[in-house]
Amino acid sequence: MQVFIMRHGDAALDAASDSVRPLTTNGCDESRLMANWLKGQKVEIERVLVSPFLRAEQTLEEVGDCLNLPSSAEVLPELTPCGDVGLVSAYLQALTNEGVASVLVISHLPLVGYLVAELCPGETPPMFTTSAIASVTLDESGNGTFNWQMSPCNLKMAKAI
């Protein structure tokens, strides 16, 4: 199964609580940029898992405007910043065993990095800037292979060359 692990877009710092921080205009733009890049890679997403925090759900909205996503996403409390990476990993393994071909996970630091490390033991987790996406291939036996990571900054630098 292909697992695309995405950190939410850039979010405002001023909010009543961490869970209600909205995306900034830049966060919306970066999320759309990454979604359009994924679309150009001919990525097909079968399932979507998202944190219940506002900025993650808004990132999903921006991505959904660009990609053909399933009509509904699974909102998982385990995908919050201090969520349980072991439970998320086990759930991804269950989806793999069910035959799901691809999943987009939208979450937060530090969980996104921990999730790559959990799925790909021995792999140094990449740094996740806002809206960055990592790709991991997860097989039926639970072995994960880190494929790549792309960020809005990488795309902007490539465009400038």
Swiss-Prot record:
Pfam families assigned to the protein according to its UniProt record, in alphabetical order: His_Phos_1
Domain of life: Bacteria
CDD domains xrefs: HP_PGM_like
Entry keywords, A to Z: Hydrolase, Protein phosphatase
InterPro entries named among the record's database cross-references: His_Pase_superF_clade-1, His_PPase_superfam, SixA
Listed GO MF terms: protein histidine phosphatase activity
Gene3D superfamilies in UniProt: Phosphoglycerate mutase-like
Enzyme class (EC, first level): hydrolase
EC number: 3.1.3.-
UniProt-listed SUPFAM superfamilies: Phosphoglycerate mutase-like (SSF53254)
Any GO BP annotation: regulation of phosphorelay signal transduction system
GO cellular component: cytoplasm
Function: Exhibits phosphohistidine phosphatase activity towards the HPt domain of the ArcB sensor involved in the multistep His-Asp phosphorelay.
Family: Belongs to the SixA phosphatase family.
Protein name: Phosphohistidine phosphatase SixA
Species of origin: Escherichia coli (strain K12)
